[in-house]
């Protein structure tokens, strides 16, 4: 992993951020109250093959029941707040103020998007990520009601496939994501996948 501070920790302009994604680099912070940001270029990258996504049987049942109403891009502020807030399972988060501001700017210009699960009129879970070319870079997800973020992920994969995306980048893999088909690929292989994804354009 490569990590270094950007020229100005408080300002990450959209153009700079998109150039970083195009070369396989993304920003993180140690924790939410740390004002500094560093850039990451992992030796191994997490991806979910869009044609290899696995939905566990219990989640299939939840999706069929239609418990959640799915919306796109209707509450970016609520989603990033949910992702940035610690929970019982995840007491620490890497989303600090500079990162919030940077992705809010990307959202304004159409390069950051949300998938949201709503339950009884309230935001129950969601995820957000960056789009560039035919690639979607998943950033973070959160849930306030069981399976909400999982339903969002399943919807995202279906939506990306339908819209012509070819790469779903999860940055890293976790046992949770591996249940859905996530796998690690070496940096060189990932960069080849990224190059192909950047050759075309897909609309979210």
Swiss-Prot record:
It comes from the Bacteria. GO terms for cellular component: cytoplasm. It is an enzyme of class 2 (transferase). It catalyses: N-terminal L-lysyl-[protein] + L-leucyl-tRNA(Leu) = N-terminal L-leucyl-L-lysyl-[protein] + tRNA(Leu) + H(+); N-terminal L-arginyl-[protein] + L-leucyl-tRNA(Leu) = N-terminal L-leucyl-L-arginyl-[protein] + tRNA(Leu) + H(+); L-phenylalanyl-tRNA(Phe) + an N-terminal L-alpha-aminoacyl-[protein] = an N-terminal L-phenylalanyl-L-alpha-aminoacyl-[protein] + tRNA(Phe). GO terms for molecular function: leucyl-tRNA--protein transferase activity. Its main location: cytoplasm. InterPro entries: Acyl_CoA_acyltransferase (IPR016181), Leu/Phe-tRNA_Trfase (IPR004616), Leu/Phe-tRNA_Trfase_C (IPR042203), Leu/Phe-tRNA_Trfase_N (IPR042221). It is found in: Cytoplasm. Disulfide bonds: none annotated. GO terms for biological process: protein catabolic process. Keywords: Acyltransferase, Cytoplasm, Transferase. It holds the Pfam family Leu_Phe_trans. Its EC number is 2.3.2.6. Belongs to the L/F-transferase family. HAMAP family: Leu_Phe_trans. Functions in the N-end rule pathway of protein degradation where it conjugates Leu, Phe and, less efficiently, Met from aminoacyl-tRNAs to the N-termini of proteins containing an N-terminal arginine or lysine. This is Leucyl/phenylalanyl-tRNA--protein transferase. It comes from Brucella abortus (strain 2308).
């Amino acid at each position: 992993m490569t990590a270094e501070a950007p020229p100005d920790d408080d300002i990450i302009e959209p153009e700079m951020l998109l150039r970083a994604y195009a070369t396989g680099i993304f920003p993180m912070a140690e924790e939410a109250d740390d004002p500094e940001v560093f850039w990451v270029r992992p030796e191994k990258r997490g991806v979910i093959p869009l044609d290899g996504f696995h939905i566990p049987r219990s989640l299939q049942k939840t999706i069929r029941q239609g418990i959640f109403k799915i919306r796109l891009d209707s509450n970016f502020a609520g989603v990033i707040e949910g992702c940035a807030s610690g929970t019982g399972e995840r007491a620490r988060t890497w989303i600090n103020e500079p990162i919030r501001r940077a992705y809010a700017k990307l959202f304004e210009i159409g390069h950051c998007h949300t998938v949201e699960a709503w339950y009884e009129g309230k935001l129950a879970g969601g995820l957000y990520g960056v789009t560039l070319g035919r690639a979607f870079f998943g950033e973070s997800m959160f849930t306030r009601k069981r399976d909400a973020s999982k339903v969002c992920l399943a919807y995202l994969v279906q939506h990306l496939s339908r819209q012509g995306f070819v790469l779903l980048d999860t940055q890293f893999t976790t046992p949770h994501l591996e249940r859905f088909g996530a796998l690690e690929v070496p940096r060189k292989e990932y960069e080849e996948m990224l190059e192909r994804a950047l050759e075309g354009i897909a609309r979210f």
